[in-house]
């Protein structure tokens, strides 16, 4: 098979994965990244010796990530992982707490402190989550999603039990209410809808596969942060011969010979777009998933804040009602990541870096309304910062007077990096079959493919890598057909 020319537009994790795998097959690959650095949303910053990720902060499905590096011939570049136990600490407004562990018995013990009956709920919930994983999760991830017919055929191969598990799925909140009596654990389960930028009151119970994945495969920290993983991917693709252009905003058009890509004015046989399909397709009326507002903090000295912690607001349903009405939450849930709790390389001695985030509504895509939303953020940011500080100090009072802001990221910043409306995942996966309506990898013209968190199979580092693998697989098949 002769070497074909492939353009990859976007240097996020999905684009890097696709570029590397296509180069490994012998294709001549050129990657165009509009920003000054690779990684897409998976960026990291260094501030006075602190290293802080500004995008994803954890890793699941480690075997998938290792497998990708193995396919790239780059296991020697892969940073080591540390599995976290406990995985995350949860705080509630009534002073109660809950800790998630990989060890189900320890998690059940923590749940029983809220109410003894919740011990049984932990076991029954995770059993049903595992069934959903087998019924829908595994077939969803084993091949590119090309339509419900192919997906249901993969489900059917798992037997009638899998078919029934898929048919009875309700919302994620309804599933949580079925197994848990306390609002605490219903909130805990509901939070996993936000991994795709959705509301637990409108997202499918299929999202229960996320806590199952964390329980079954663990929550991991990459030494040096996710930014170190991006650096390793960048080294891998360059070593494979991929030509990388940074600070280059590429455009493409379909022509008889293939695709002309500007500004290089060269013709390519195939194009992989590592950008949200909604932005590329300009669907301004498409509802968007949530965005986020991030503070990067420096703390004087070390802190008792665990690696991952969540501080819930008091009324979870109201919080999502406000967010999807385009408003900031009055009492937001706050997530904090303290990577130096596990990895001393992330901060110098005597100092700590914290990543702190709240959910935020995506900005409108229509130009006039988008301009107003950007102006609104200029006046809203200070209020959101105060809410985040108040909640952080309420649950970790030793932080008072020791914290300094060293950076922030708003939906405006995400939009500037190409996220439609600043939405983290673009497509909104609400509805019973929401996850299966996600934009597909195959584009609308021959030889065009998409990779990234906005397409199948979804967001998060391993799934974005998988989208890159699928895009490379489909592009290679196309190139063989036209060779």
Residue ranges and their predicted role:
Residues 2-137, 427:
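N-terminal glycine-rich phosphate/pyrophosphate-binding loop and immediately adjacent elements
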Residues 130-240, 416-431:
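Active-site/ligand-binding neighborhood in enzyme catalytic cores
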Residues 182-196, 331-335, 394-457:
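A glycine-rich dinucleotide-binding beta-alpha-beta segment and adjacent secondary-structure elements
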Residues 237-250:
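A conserved beta-strand/loop element that lines the FAD pocket in flavoprotein oxidoreductases
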Residues 248-348:
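Mid-domain catalytic core of redox enzymes
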Residues 335, 341-425:
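FAD-dependent oxidoreductase catalytic-site/capping-region signature
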Residues 453-475:
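A conserved FAD-binding loop/helix module that cradles the flavin
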Residues 477-483:
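Active-site-proximal substrate-binding core of FAD-dependent oxidoreductases
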């Amino acid at each position: 098979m002769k070497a074909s020319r492939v353009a990859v537009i976007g240097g996020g994790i999905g684009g890097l994965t696709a570029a590397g795998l296509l180069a490994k097959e012998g294709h001549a690959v050129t990657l165009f990244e509009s920003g000054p650095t690779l990684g897409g949303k998976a960026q990291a910053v260094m501030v006075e010796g602190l290293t802080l990720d500004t995008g994803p902060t954890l890793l699941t499905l480690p075997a998938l990530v290792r497998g990708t590096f193995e396919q790239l011939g780059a296991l020697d570049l892969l940073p080591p992982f540390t599995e976290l136990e406990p995985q995350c600490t949860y705080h509630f407004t009534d002073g109660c707490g809950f800790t998630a562990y990989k060890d189900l018995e320890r998690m059940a013990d923590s749940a029983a402190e809220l109410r003894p009956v919740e011990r049984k709920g932990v076991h029954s919930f995770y059993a049903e989550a595992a069934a959903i994983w087998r019924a829908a999760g595994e077939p969803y991830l084993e091949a590119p999603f090309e339509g419900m017919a192919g997906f249901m055929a993969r489900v059917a191969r798992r037997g009638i039990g899998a078919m029934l598990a898929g048919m009875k799925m309700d919302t994620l909140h309804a599933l949580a209410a079925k197994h848990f009596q306390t609002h605490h654990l219903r909130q805990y389960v509901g939070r996993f809808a936000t991994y795709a930028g959705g509301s637990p009151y409108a997202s499918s119970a299929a999202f229960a596969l996320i806590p199952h994945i964390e329980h079954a495969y663990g929550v991991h920290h990459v030494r040096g942060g996710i930014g170190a993983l991006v650096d390793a991917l960048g080294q891998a693709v360059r070593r494979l011969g991929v030509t990388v252009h940074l600070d280059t905003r590429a455009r493409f058009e379909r022509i008889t010979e293939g695709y002309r890509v500007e500004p290089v004015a060269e013709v390519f046989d195939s194009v992989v777009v590592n950008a949200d399909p909604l932005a590329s397709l300009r669907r301004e009326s498409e509802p968007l998933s949530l965005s986020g507002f991030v503070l990067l903090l420096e703390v004087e000295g070390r802190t008792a804040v665990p690696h991952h912690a969540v501080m819930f607001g008091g009324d979870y349903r109201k919080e999502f009602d406000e967010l999807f009405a385009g408003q900031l939450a009055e009492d937001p849930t706050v997530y904090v990541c303290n990577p130096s709790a596990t990895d001393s390389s992330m901060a110098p001695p005597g100092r700590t870096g914290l990543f702190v985030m709240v959910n935020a509504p995506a900005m409108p895509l229509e130009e006039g309304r988008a301009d107003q939303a950007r102006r609104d953020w200029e006046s809203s940011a200070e209020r959101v910062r105060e809410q985040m500080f108040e909640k952080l100090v309420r649950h970790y009072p030793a932080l008072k007077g020791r914290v300094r802001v060293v950076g922030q990221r708003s939906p405006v910043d995400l939009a500037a990096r190409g996220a439609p409306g600043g939405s983290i995942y673009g497509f909104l996966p609400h509805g019973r079959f929401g996850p299966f309506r996600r934009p597909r990898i195959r584009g609308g013209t021959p030889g065009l493919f998409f990779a990234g968190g906005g397409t199948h199979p979804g967001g998060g580092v391993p799934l974005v890598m998988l989208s890159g693998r699928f895009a490379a697989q489909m592009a290679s098949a196309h190139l063989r057909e036209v060779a």
